[in-house]
Amino acid sequence: MNPIRKIIHIDMDCFYAAIEMRDFPELANKPIAVGGDAKRRGVIATCNYAARQFGIRSAMPTAHALKLCRELILRPVRMDVYQKESQYIRSLLTEYTDLVEPLSLDEAYLDVTESTQCQGSATWIAEEIRARIYQTRQLTASAGIAPNKSLAKIASDWHKPNGQMVIRPEDVSAFVLDLPVRKLFGVGPKMEEKLGALNIKTCADLQRYSVEYLLQKFGTMGQRLYELARGIDNRPVNPERIRKSISVEETYPKDLPNSEACLAVLPDLMARLEARIQRAGKISGIHNLFVKLKFNDFQQTTIERVMDKLDLIVLRQLIQEGFARRGMPVRLLGIGIKLKQENTYQSIQLPLLDL
């Protein structure tokens, strides 16, 4: 039986505008927008919440936005800056799981079902991610946590800005009943109008119709509507990038006091890593082995060695070398492999280790 999934949707709050306010503090609390010149028929890329109070929205013609708010401060698009910030945030997200699916520069899905970070709590992972983004970039993010992508995205918008919401598996059925159909993935203004003509305004209304009727009325979208109205969304989180590593890690309730204690938990980590490699199927071959240690002062170190196979002895050596760098109790220990970035793929033959 497959485990209930833990999906997080991270959505940066008015990303481009937030970067402008951070870099130019004098803009704080003033209505600002990022977009093209009105004289060149430009459009608004995004705006801050002060500007939204005037009715300004993304994709609105800049000339119209300036009519709605004469005090609007228009900032030019600095795409290189926004891309750099997005890359940093994306790198941070991959510290929690390899299963990160970017949707744009300012939002992404994470599947943390198998993550052991923050004691395996998706809620705590989302809180930590948001806190780290603010601490390191002075930008806020909102998060939604749910058993699937559709609900996670809905939840991330619930307490914006700078908030998060959890939809627990046992609460899904009750949550969707009063949910407006416009909130469903794929339901735009035209589809909302078609549903409204049938007096379908909420998911409870939609649940009254059979899948056969919805298929007849809306084609393949009918099946989707039938499932979404019941909180069903089986789409996987698909990482955009080629997988570069496979790893496992554990945050321990009691710090590991010395290198011997770290070595004592290695067999369990090794077994989990082998299982994860097996699930990955054919991969491009091993290039490096690495270990990660996070000490009780929250400083961390990573040490690696070029190897073409999984080797317990080498991992033991890396743990000892990594521990010696600080010689402090360890709160998190991880091991993993980095994969060859080649077009040839192979099945990894795992060693039969005497653990």
From Swiss-Prot:
Cofactor note: Binds 2 magnesium ions per subunit.
Gene name linked to the record: dinB
Protein name: DNA polymerase IV
Chain residues that bind Mg(2+): D11, D106
Boundaries of every UmuC domain copy: 7-188
EC number in record: 2.7.7.7
The reaction(s) this protein catalyses: DNA(n) + a 2'-deoxyribonucleoside 5'-triphosphate = DNA(n+1) + diphosphate
Pfam families, alphabetized: IMS, IMS_C, IMS_HHH_1
The organism's place on the tree of life at top rank: Bacteria
SUPFAM superfamilies named in the record: DNA/RNA polymerases, Lesion bypass DNA polymerase (Y-family), little finger domain
